Amino acid sequence: MTGGDALPAIQHDDRLDHILLSRRSTKQFTDSPLSLAEIAHALWTVAGTTTAGHRVGASARATYPIATTLVAGEIDGLAMGAYLYHPVEHTLVITRSGDQRPAVAEASLDAASWLPGCPAAILLSADVAAARERFPDQPAVHGERFVWIEVGLAAQNAYLWAAERGVGTVLLAGLDDERATGSCRGLIPHRHELLGILPLGEPAQSAS
């Protein structure tokens, strides 16, 4: 489609513009560890609370169905394992110790070769069945739709944080649901489905 009224040229003279211009998807990482402070900030950016008691991401009727799980690999000051992030308290509660990155990689369709080498990953999950019943005044599909929208909002927050900090990430949503159910059992909350994986680490080379 062509034609129409021309808009003013974008000047790209503010901080958000520069962050958006540097946003990339990264699938190759170095083995450099991340700091616990970096991980804390990443988790807050994805799912944290603000000083007004709200969250950093919007949620339909403030239901906040998305759970955030950290899979820690090479993080200075934090043992390998899976940790559930509690945003109100800004704390981590371990769900399984040891290196869980290979198990998470099994859930992906095309990241099994490189995901186990990422220093960390954030898992986004939700009880989708419960979400379908959460809005009785609307069709059940709306509850599930809201969940997916909120996954996108959380992922975009992660992208913006990563772009500002020079950290690499990518949203992995191409998942094998059956394998994910088995490999992530005990890592994410009971009855939750894995909806997205956000690897985190130092980019090894230019991303797209």
Where are the model-predicted features located?
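Short helix/loop capping segments that flank catalytic or ligand/cofactor-binding pockets
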Residues: 29, 79, 132-133, 207-208
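Short, surface-exposed helix-loop/turn micro-motifs enriched in polar/charged residues
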Residues: 60, 169-172, 190
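Short proline/glycine-enriched turn/loop segments at secondary-structure junctions
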Residues: 183-190
